[in-house]
């Protein structure tokens, strides 16, 4: 099945509110297009230092009640840093406790600020040991990494190649820490776009078969003439740019962003109809012994067929996990065609 991560929504696992698990609970009980593919209970930057322990407690307390009904995957972001042993020690403790107490409700963990490949291997070893101590099957917990340091960027290819025989399932770009580590400056209020890095991330993750996720967009709201309004256009521009260069999903900081990114990273009605028309025609041609066929002026052969098939397989994956989203987004006849068409690979 196609691995879905259109949305990577971080939610502080503890905040200074009467209900400190407010945002965690909101993510776990989200519905419709506001449900992320990956929910990331955040123990790291999103949670104040004084509330880290409470953040872990909240995850342990809330997951048994809410995780069974949550449609997406759950991967907490723990503390970690390639250049700080204390952070790695705390992260190890967090992984071990969560795997032991709620491991059956987790799909994996997110490790921030990893360094070179040796540090990635260390993080993978922490997960493997936590699985053993918790009595979980080997490989039950996946690992996602946040690419936000110069050493990790230098070893990007090696890290992605490590994924081919490991539990590594996703790489996420962290532009704020990366810019700071490189000494970058936000001149004129504009941050770097890092197009070269994103294109490399898209290429290397595609070659390794892991998902690539873009960085956060923190300009959530604008204010004008005393009115504050959600910056939907700015976020959509970033997500659409990521989608055009093959980034699989986008970082979300807010349910409104999740709803936008879920839709943008979803084949449009026109894309799906076009893919189905060409798949159906090519299937007929193959049955008649023809290796290629012209459909709507385009030559469709095995290579282009796979591109159209990927569109259909993504829709099927979304429908498997989020049927309310596909039911709202596509008309019934088109969705039925997508679910029933034969997808043939040589």
Residue ranges and their predicted role:
Residues 1-346:
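Expand to "…catalyze enediolate/carbanion chemistry for C-C bond making/breaking, isomerization
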